[in-house]
Amino acid sequence: MDLAANEISIYDKLSETVDLVRQTGHQCGMSEKAIEKFIRQLLEKNEPQRPPPQYPLLIVVYKVLATLGLILLTAYFVIQPFSPLAPEPVLSGAHTWRSLIHHIRLMSLPIAKKYMSENKGVPLHVGDEDRPFPDFDPWWTNDCEQNESEPIPANCTGCAQKHLKVMLLEDAPRKFERLHPLVIKTGKPLLSEEIQHFLCQYPEATEGFSEGFFAKWWRCFPERWFPFPYPWRRPLNRSQILRELFPVFTHLPFPKDASLNKCFFLHPEPVVGSKMHKMPDLFIIGSGEAMLQLIPPFQCRRHCQSVAMPIEPGDIGYVDTTHWKVYIIARGVQPLVICDGTAFSEL
């Protein structure tokens, strides 16, 4: 208000000065053109000047922050389109809940106990007869009645003769068998700190972890200034990442080129079993609970049995996908963190 009033008073004085100059010019016999020229020169020399800003440092800081924010926002929108998309075959297909009920509806019937007690479950190791076996037997169901006299086709021997093995970590085999499906119960789930560290270090290998831009930046700072995929970043050593995230793999018989693909975050479906996620040959449950479903190829269902069993945090599974279709169904109330990969090199 003081500045505006000051400007008004200045212009009033200038107006009085111009009138006085005009009268004096007429009295001295000056032409109108000469008077206007003299007034113009007078106004140019006496133009009021605004005072400098009172807070120059604050204005500079404001401009720097605005420029930095604009640069970060531009970089985010430039880099985001280059982020790798989710692989289509994995975790992209959803089967109806009727398919799940079709394969496991016999589990609650008394006749299912008969099939589970005919040595088709988990084989005992030597010396295990005296100790109580953990309660994680797989559930076997027959889609079709098997004819023992009918010869087994060559492409069905893998699922007909190699049944799923479920074992503890100390019972893990020393030699890797490619055709033998197995679930190793390590009892070592991923901690929340390990998951957060993985999200910051390898954002390219994660999917489904919904988190705001600033929340993710604040959580990863200062360990990583910009926790998002860089298009110019070198290809990840996924074999090293697998053993870094799950050190137990250094003691397991999997090939050295076994690698991690992605880690997913899944919410349990409102209807249990309404969505089945297709998996590759290697998978690890980081946290949460799920149901594992193994389905043989259609042409082998007269000779092979479907398998369904619950799996827990820390469970490591391997299944040869040439003889089985592998599905995971999230269950329980806690979100499911599951990592998938492959036991063999892609080359």
Swiss-Prot record:
Coiled coil: none
Annotated localization: Golgi apparatus membrane; Cytoplasm
One Gene Ontology cellular component: Golgi membrane
Ranges of the Cytoplasmic topological domain: 1-58
Alphabetized UniProt keyword annotations: Cytoplasm, Glycoprotein, Golgi apparatus, Membrane, Signal-anchor, Transmembrane, Transmembrane helix
Annotated protein name in UniProt: Bombesin receptor-activated protein C6orf89 homolog
Subunit structure: Homodimer. Interacts with BRS3. Interacts (via N-terminus) with SIN3B.
Membrane topology classification: Single-pass type II membrane protein
InterPro entries referenced in this protein's UniProt entry, alphabetically: BRAP
Transmembrane segments: 59-79
Superkingdom, taxonomy of origin: Eukaryota
Gene Ontology biological process terms, A to Z: chromatin remodeling; epithelial cell proliferation; positive regulation of cell cycle; wound healing
Biological function: Exhibits histone deacetylase (HDAC) enhancer properties. May play a role in cell cycle progression and wound repair of bronchial epithelial cells.
Topological domains, Extracellular: 80-347
Post-translational modification: Glycosylated.
Presence of the UniProt keyword Transmembrane in the record: yes
